[in-house]
Curated annotation (Swiss-Prot):
Residue(s) carrying Cysteine amide: 16
GO molecular function terms noted in the UniProt entry: acetylcholine receptor inhibitor activity; ion channel regulator activity; toxin activity
Record remark on domains: The cysteine framework is I (CC-C-C). Alpha4/3 pattern.
Other facts: Negative results: does not inhibit alpha-2-beta-2, alpha-2-beta-4, alpha-3-beta-4, alpha-4-beta-2, alpha-4-beta-2 nAChRs.
Source organism, top-level taxon: Eukaryota
Stated name of the protein: Alpha-conotoxin ImII
Length: 17
C-alpha cells in the first residue's frame, strides 16, 4: 500500500514502473 514512498525509494522504485 506504499506506492509513492516506493517510487521515491531506489530499491522499491523498480516497482513503480
Amino acid at each position: 500500500i506504499v506506492r509513492r514512498a516506493c517510487c521515491s525509494d531506489r530499491r522499491c522504485r523498480w516497482r513503480c514502473g
